From Swiss-Prot:
<dbReference type="GO" id="GO:0042431">
    <property type="term" value="P:indole metabolic process"/>
</dbReference>
<feature type="modified residue" description="Phosphoserine">
    <location>
        <position position="625"/>
    </location>
</feature>
<keyword id="KW-0769">Symport</keyword>
<feature type="disulfide bond">
    <location>
        <begin position="225"/>
        <end position="522"/>
    </location>
</feature>
<dbReference type="GO" id="GO:0032026">
    <property type="term" value="P:response to magnesium ion"/>
</dbReference>
<comment type="function">
    <text>Involved in actively transporting phosphate into cells via Na(+) cotransport in the renal brush border membrane. The cotransport has a Na(+):Pi stoichiometry of 3:1 and is electrogenic.</text>
</comment>
<dbReference type="GO" id="GO:0097066">
    <property type="term" value="P:response to thyroid hormone"/>
</dbReference>
<dbReference type="GO" id="GO:0010288">
    <property type="term" value="P:response to lead ion"/>
</dbReference>
<feature type="transmembrane region" description="Helical; Name=M4">
    <location>
        <begin position="348"/>
        <end position="370"/>
    </location>
</feature>
<dbReference type="GO" id="GO:2000187">
    <property type="term" value="P:positive regulation of phosphate transmembrane transport"/>
</dbReference>
<feature type="transmembrane region" description="Helical; Name=M7">
    <location>
        <begin position="514"/>
        <end position="534"/>
    </location>
</feature>
<keyword id="KW-1133">Transmembrane helix</keyword>
<dbReference type="GO" id="GO:0001503">
    <property type="term" value="P:ossification"/>
</dbReference>
<feature type="topological domain" description="Cytoplasmic">
    <location>
        <begin position="1"/>
        <end position="103"/>
    </location>
</feature>
<dbReference type="GO" id="GO:0044877">
    <property type="term" value="F:protein-containing complex binding"/>
</dbReference>
<dbReference type="GO" id="GO:0071248">
    <property type="term" value="P:cellular response to metal ion"/>
</dbReference>
<dbReference type="GO" id="GO:0030643">
    <property type="term" value="P:intracellular phosphate ion homeostasis"/>
</dbReference>
Length: 639
C-alpha cells in the first residue's frame, strides 16, 4: 500500500499553485477531498489539475451533474472571512431596521390622508345631493310613515355620507317643531344603516386578493347585517309600542339637564388644516332648506366668506352677495382660502370633481396602507399583534373580552367623532387577518355606541328651549343601538351578523362583481322599492310585504334545514336543483357578466413560443473524465 506522501508524489497529482487551481467534482469524483479538508491535514496540499485549462475542462465535463468549482486554498483568508461574517450580517439588519423606521411615518402620513379623503368624500356627496336631501326631509307627510321615514334616513345618509349631518338635520327639524319625535325615530334608524356604506366601499379596494377581499368584505358587512337585523325587529316593535319614545321621554323628564358645550373637535383639529385648503361648506343651507326656509334655496353650499379668527363660521351668502360684500369692505369677514372659492362652478360640478379626486386619494392611500401593513406585519410581529388583539381574557372572565372591545370601539369612535372613519380604518386590518371578524364585531358595536355619545354632547349644546327634544332624539339613537346589542350579542347563538357576514364574504370572494351588486341593492334599489310601495298606502304595503316576507322566511328555514338536518325534508326539497339554475345559483349571471367584460376588454398579447424541449436521451454521450490514481478504499478524507 502506498503511503500518503507517495500518493501525493504520483504523476497523476501535482501540487496546487498559490492561487487558482480547478477541482473537478461530480459523481465520478465523489472521493476527491476539497481543499478546505486537506488544509486541516498537516503536511498536505490540495489535489488539482493544473495541466487542464478551462477549455480542456469544458471538454471533459458531462451533463450528468458534474460541477466545476474554484476553491481558495489559503486558510488565513478563510479565517478572515469567518471573522467578517457577523459584520456582513449586521449591515442588512441595519438596513432593514432603517426601512422599518422609515415606513412608520409614511404609514401615518397615508393614514392621515386616508381620513382626510373620507372627509372630502362626505363634502362631495353633500355638494352633489345635499339640497335634494333637504327637500326629502321637508315633506312631513312622507316622514309620518315609519317605513318611508326609515328609507329616507338611509337615502339621505348615503347621499351626504355622514350620519352626523343627517342626525343634525333631524334634531333641527324636531327642535323647530316641524317633526315629531315619534316620526323622527325611524329616520334615526335609517341613518344608522346608511352610515355603514362607507366601510363597504373601502372593502372594495382589497378586491385584488380573494382571501383578503373575503375577510375585508365580511368585516365591513357585519356592520350592515347588525343594523338591518336590528331594524327588522325594532322598527315593528317601535311602531306597535313606541318603547323608545317612552323610555327617552322618561329619561329626559327625570334629569335636570342643562345646556353644555359643543362636542369636542378632536380629530378635526388635525384634519381641518388640510381639508379647509380643498373645500369649505356651509352646512346650514341644507338645514335651512329642510326646515322650510326657501330664502337659501338659490345659495351655494360652497363657503365664500369666513371669520378671520376662525375660518369655520358659516355664512349664508351667495357668490353675488359675497362679491358685493367685498366691495362694501366688511371688516368682520374675509375671503375663505380654498381651491374652489373663485371657480364660479355650480355645486354639482364641484361635487363631482371633488368626488373623483377623493375616491382617487382614498384608493391610493388604502392600497399603499395595505402594502405597508403587509410588509410591517410579518413573521413574529404579526403573530404577536394577532394574539394581543384576538386573545380572550383568561377564564372565568372570557365573556368580558367582547364587552371590553366594545368600550375600546366606543372610545376610539368618540376620539375620531365618526363611526365611518373608525370602521373604515379597521377594514384593511380585517382583510390582512390582523383582526378577526369575531373581534371586529364587538368593535363595530362599540363604534355604534360611540357615535351616539357624540350626538348626545352635540344635543347638550342646543339652546334651552330646544334642549329637551334634541336630547331625546340623541337618546333614541343611543337606546336603539343598546337594544340591538342586547338582541344580537350576549348569547353566542344569536350572533347572526357574524354568520351572515361570513357567507357574504365567501360569495363575494367567488364572484367579485357581487360586491357592487350588494351595494346597489341594499343601499339604493331595495330602499327605493320599499319607499315606492309604502307611498301607495299601508294596504298596498301589507299586501306586497306579507307574501314577500313569508317567502323569505320559508327560504331561510329550508336553507337551515338543508345544511343541518336534510333528512327531515323530502328528497325533492333537500336541494334546490328542481328549480331553474338561475334561481338558485349565480353562475349563469357570472357567465353573462364575464362575457360582457371580455367583449369590452382588450385582447391580451400572446406570449412568445417556448423553446423546444431537450430530453436526456437526445444529449450526446459524455466524454469520460480523468480519474485519480488512488486506491478505492483509502480516501484522504478518512485519514
Amino acid at each position: 500500500m502506498l503511503s500518503y506522501g507517495e500518493r501525493l508524489g504520483s504523476p497523476a497529482v501535482s501540487p496546487l499553485p498559490v492561487r487558482g487551481g480547478h477541482v473537478m467534482r461530480g459523481t465520478a469524483f465523489a472521493y476527491v477531498p476539497s481543499p478546505q479538508v486537506l488544509h486541516r491535514i498537516p503536511g498536505t496540499s490540495a489535489y488539482a489539475f493544473p495541466s487542464l485549462g478551462p477549455v480542456a475542462l469544458a471538454e471533459h465535463t458531462c451533463p450528468c451533474g458534474e460541477v466545476l468549482e474554484r476553491h481558495e486554498p489559503l486558510p488565513a483568508k478563510l479565517a478572515l472571512e469567518e471573522e467578517q461574517k457577523p459584520e456582513s450580517r449586521l449591515v442588512p439588519k441595519l438596513r432593514q431596521a432603517g426601512a422599518m423606521l422609515l415606513k412608520v411615518p409614511l404609514m401615518l402620513t397615508f393614514l392621515y390622508l386616508f381620513v382626510c379623503s373620507l372627509d372630502m368624500l362626505s363634502s362631495a356627496f353633500q355638494l352633489a345631493g345635499g339640497k335634494v336631501a333637504g327637500d326629502i326631509f321637508k315633506d312631513n307627510a312622507i316622514l309620518s310613515n315609519p317605513v318611508a321615514g326609515l328609507v329616507v334616513g338611509i337615502l339621505v345618509t348615503v347621499l351626504v355620507q355622514s350620519s352626523s349631518t343627517s342626525t343634525s338635520i333631524i334634531v333641527s327639524m324636531v327642535s323647530s317643531g316641524l317633526l315629531e319625535v315619534s316620526s323622527a325615530i325611524p329616520i334615526i334608524m335609517g341613518s344608522n344603516i346608511g352610515t355603514s356604506v362607507t366601510n363597504t366601499i373601502v372593502a372594495l379596494m382589497q378586491a385584488g386578493d380573494r382571501t383578503d377581499f373575503r375577510r375585508a368584505f365580511a368585516g365591513a358587512t357585519v356592520h350592515d347585517c347588525f343594523n338591518w337585523l336590528s331594524v327588522l325587529v325594532l322598527l315593528p316593535l317601535e311602531a306597535a309600542t313606541g318603547y323608545l319614545h317612552h323610555i327617552t321621554r322618561l329619561v329626559v323628564a327625570s334629569f335636570n339637564i342643562h345646556g353644555g358645550r359643543d362636542a369636542p373637535d378632536l380629530l378635526k383639529i388635525i384634519t381641518e388644516p388640510f381639508t379647509k385648503l380643498i373645500i369649505q361648506l356651509d352646512e346650514s343651507v341644507i338645514t335651512s332648506i329642510a326646515t322650510g326656509d326657501e330664502s337659501l334655496r338659490n345659495h351655494s353650499l360652497i363657503q365664500i366668506w369666513c371669520h378671520p379668527d376662525s375660518l369655520q363660521a358659516p355664512t349664508s351668502m351667495s357668490r353675488a352677495e359675497a362679491n358685493s360684500s367685498q366691495t362694501l369692505g366688511n371688516a368682520t369677514m374675509e375671503k375663505c382660502n380654498h381651491i374652489f372659492v373663485d371657480t364660479g362652478l355650480p355645486d354639482l360640478a364641484v361635487g363631482l370633481i371633488l368626488l373623483a379626486g377623493s375616491l382617487v386619494l382614498l384608493c391610493t392611500c388604502l392600497i399603499l396602507l395595505v402594502k405597508m401593513l403587509n410588509s410591517l406585519l410579518k413573521g413574529q410581529v404579526a403573530k404577536v399583534i394577532q394574539k394581543v388583539i384576538n386573545t380572550d381574557f383568561p377564564a372565568p372572565f372570557t365573556w368580558v373580552t367582547g364587552y371590553f372591545a366594545m368600550v375600546v370601539g366606543a372610545s376610539m369612535t368618540f376620539v375620531v367623532q365618526s363611526s365611518s372613519v373608525f370602521t373604515s380604518a379597521i377594514t384593511p386590518l380585517i382583510g390582512l387577518g390582523v383582526i378577526s371578524i369575531e373581534r371586529a364585531y364587538p368593535l363595530t358595536l362599540g363604534s355604534n355606541i360611540g357615535t351616539t355619545t357624540t350626538a348626545i354632547l352635540a344635543a347638550l349644546a342646543s339652546p334651552r328651549e330646544k334642549l329637551s327634544s334634541a336630547f331625546q332624539i340623541a337618546l333614541c339613537h343611543f337606546f336603539f343601538n343598546i337594544s340591538g346589542i342586547l338582541l344580537w350579542y350576549p348569547v353566542p347563538c344569536t350572533r347572526l351578523p357574524i354568520r351572515m357576514a361570513k357567507a357574504l364574504g365567501k360569495r363575494t370572494a367567488k364572484y367579485r362583481w357581487f360586491a357592487v351588486l350588494y351595494l346597489l341593492v341594499c343601499f339604493l334599489l331595495l330602499p327605493s322599492l320599499v319607499f315606492g310601495i309604502s307611498m301607495a298606502g299601508w294596504q298596498v304595503m301589507v299586501g306586497v310585504g306579507t307574501p314577500f316576507g313569508a317567502l323569505l322566511a320559508f327560504v331561510v328555514l329550508i336553507n337551515v334545514l338543508q345544511s343541518r338536518s336534510p333528512g327531515h325534508l323530502p328528497k325533492w326539497l333537500q336541494t334546490w336543483d328542481f328549480l331553474p339554475r338561475w334561481m338558485h345559483s349565480l353562475k349563469p349571471l357570472d357567465h353573462l357578466i364575464t362575457r360582457a367584460t371580455l367583449c369590452c376588454a382588450r385582447p391580451e398579447p400572446r406570449s412568445p413560443p417556448l423553446p423546444p424541449r431537450v430530453f436526456l436521451e437526445e444529449l450526446p454521450p459524455a466524454t469520460p473524465s480523468p480519474r485519480l490514481a488512488l486506491p478505492a478504499h483509502h480516501n484522504a478524507t478518512r485519514l
